[in-house]
């Protein structure tokens, strides 16, 4: 929304038979005039607004007043009937405010909240030190949050990154590490379903499989392509980028001994490539967070903690065995 021709760009997108599903924003540039122009053009995307915890948003965004601006933008969008999803980074500094933050967002009419473990990206480690939650710490504290949140009476759905989806209205939940159930796995599945449907393009034109990996790829000089130097058509039909996003899960199992010998592989399919790269430096390595989840019994712990609710990712296996 920072671009001076933002509305013209939106208009041209729709003129070409495409549409905008969502807009990611910190809320600063959201004003009534902007929403009026969108409504006039029949444009009503999901507004994904960053909000990183009551009393902590200003610190993470590096600007005094950022929290107030975000809340103002949320209220404005809801008053104009635009759907809102909140994206919240969780770390050791704001962890204790998470439940109150969720209740506030629900009271503002937010449709969904996505809680993201702030991972070990280069800039985060440089600026925040050891504020990132360890993997077991993340699972333990998010499970405490999930159990408490489901009892609040809130209606807002919550996604806990790489862990849980909570649906309080229907009284159900799903475990994200369980990508596939017993009869769903096959070797030809993509290593990441998300990157098959979304292209990450940086302001400089560099293209990446995943926005969360842009900093790591840039730091390593690993650039699969650039839309200012090559056509998007070429990049999506015959390129290094295409080879990377079309990699199948059997390549992970062939490459990584741990995955090859793991009885849980058919459930997680090697896990998240972003986490595997950030935590191990290996594009085809095991995602350590999934090894912790299955190997340390978090499937069973979650079923126990949320036993009052329906688990729509129920699988038949004996959890808690070290891998």
Protein language model features and the residues they cover:
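Radical SAM/AdoMet-radical enzyme domain recognition
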Residues: 3-134, 138
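Short, solvent-exposed loop/turn segments at secondary-structure junctions
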Residues: 29, 54, 91-93, 120, ...
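C-terminal accessory region of radical SAM enzymes
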Residues: 136-179, 206, 212-260
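Radical SAM enzyme core and accessory elements
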Residues: 173, 202-210, 215-222, 227-230, ...
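Short Pro/Gly-enriched beta-strand edge/turn motifs at strand-loop
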Residues: 178-186
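Short, small/polar residue-rich loop motifs at catalytic or cofactor-binding pockets
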Residues: 192-196
């Amino acid at each position: 929304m920072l671009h001076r021709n933002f509305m013209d760009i939106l208009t041209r997108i729709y003129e070409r038979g495409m549409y905008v599903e969502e807009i990611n924003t910190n809320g600063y540039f959201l004003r009534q005039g902007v929403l009026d122009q969108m409504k006039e053009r029949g444009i009503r995307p999901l507004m994904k607004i960053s909000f990183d915890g009551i009393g902590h948003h200003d610190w993470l965004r590096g600007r005094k007043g950022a929290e107030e601006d975000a809340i103002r933008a949320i209220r404005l969008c809801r008053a104009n009937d635009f759907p809102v999803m909140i994206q919240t980074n969780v770390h050791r500094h704001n962890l204790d405010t998470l439940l109150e933050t969720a209740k506030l967002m629900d009271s503002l009419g937010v449709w969904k909240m996505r809680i993201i473990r702030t991972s070990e990206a280069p800039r985060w480690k440089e600026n925040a030190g050891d504020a990132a939650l360890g993997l077991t710490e993340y699972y333990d504290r998010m499970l405490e949050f999930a159990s408490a949140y489901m009892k609040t009476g809130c209606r807002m759905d919550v996604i806990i990154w790489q862990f849980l989806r909570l649906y309080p209205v229907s009284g159900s939940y799903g475990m994200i590490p369980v990508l596939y159930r017993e009869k769903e796995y096959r070797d030809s599945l993509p290593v990441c379903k998300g990157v098959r449907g979304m292209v990450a393009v940086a302001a400089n034109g560099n293209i990446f499989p995943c926005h969360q990996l842009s900093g790591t790829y840039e730091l390593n000089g690993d650039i699969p392509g650039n839309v200012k130097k090559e056509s998007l058509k070429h990049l999506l039909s015959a390129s290094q980028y295409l080879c990377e996003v079309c990699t199948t899960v059997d390549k992970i199992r062939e490459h990584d001994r741990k995955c090859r010998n793991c009885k849980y592989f058919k459930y997680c399919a090697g896990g998240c490539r972003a986490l595997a790269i950030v935590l191990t430096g290996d594009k085809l390595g095991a995602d350590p967070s999934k090894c912790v989840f299955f190997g340390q019994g978090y499937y069973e712990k979650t079923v126990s903690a949320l036993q009052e609710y329906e688990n729509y990712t129920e699988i038949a296996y004996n959890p808690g065995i070290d891998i």
